[in-house]
Amino acid sequence: MILTKNSNEKKPLKKGLFIVFEGIDGAGKTSILKQLLEVLKEPKLVNKIFLTREPGGKNNNAAEMIREFFLKNLEVFDPLTLAYLYASSRAEHVKKTINPHLEKDHIVISDRFVHSSYIYQGIVQNQSLDVIYQINQQAIGELEIDYVFYFDVNVNNALNRMKNRFDNTNAFDSQNKQFYEKLLKQYPSVFKVYNQPKKIIFIDANKNENEVLCEVKEQLLKIFKEHKYI
């Protein structure tokens, strides 16, 4: 029996809003994230939204150094070692980037966070999810995710996008179709058990990019209004 890794104890209200985009490679979340500041032009949101990504972190030299080191050497590490390396980068990201922005009441939107480790370092590489949880709790402390946007895409669409994109790919992008099918089956269940966000928003990422961008924008504006940012 797997116990839900969430505490029911009441914690002090934190400032800011923490939103995470999750999904397999090729789901399109990174492309959408890069366009958000162009489409979210509400005056009250100026200087309020901070976009970042994992592994690593925007304007975070330590997290980026760790990222660069292990992404260049993925094949040489034991899976458990990789889990620690990802968590080490995440610890730097949380302590030096995410938490400081939340303390300023900013809206932090991250391309990937802890659930990616449960999928990639846990399920895919046959590591205990409880161990992955313990490692990452040291990294993130009491930080909680407010919203997860899960970009749901079928494997064929994801693989086609990866083949057509022009940026450099890492070793995970070269895995076969079965690899990504395994990820798709496990993602939703992981959200329910570990570091459960306050709300999960499913995005149909099989649509064209403009349609997905409009849907994400609409959902985000609803959230910002609910939390009185606009």
UniProtKB/Swiss-Prot annotation:
ATP binds at G23, I24, D25, G26, A27, G28, K29, T30. It holds the Pfam family Thymidylate_kin. HAMAP family: Thymidylate_kinase. It comes from Ureaplasma parvum serovar 3 (strain ATCC 700970). The lineage of its organism: Bacteria, Bacillati, Mycoplasmatota, Mycoplasmoidales, Mycoplasmoidaceae. Its EC number is 2.7.4.9. Keywords: ATP-binding, Kinase, Nucleotide biosynthesis, Nucleotide-binding, Transferase. The keyword Kinase applies. This is Thymidylate kinase. Belongs to the thymidylate kinase family. InterPro entries: P-loop_NTPase (IPR027417), Thymidylate_kin-like_dom (IPR039430), Thymidylate_kinase (IPR018094). GO terms for biological process: dTDP biosynthetic process; dTTP biosynthetic process; dUDP biosynthetic process. One of its GO terms (cellular component) is cytosol. SUPFAM superfamilies: P-loop containing nucleoside triphosphate hydrolases (SSF52540). One of its GO terms (molecular function) is ATP binding. It catalyses: dTMP + ATP = dTDP + ADP. Phosphorylation of dTMP to form dTDP in both de novo and salvage pathways of dTTP synthesis.
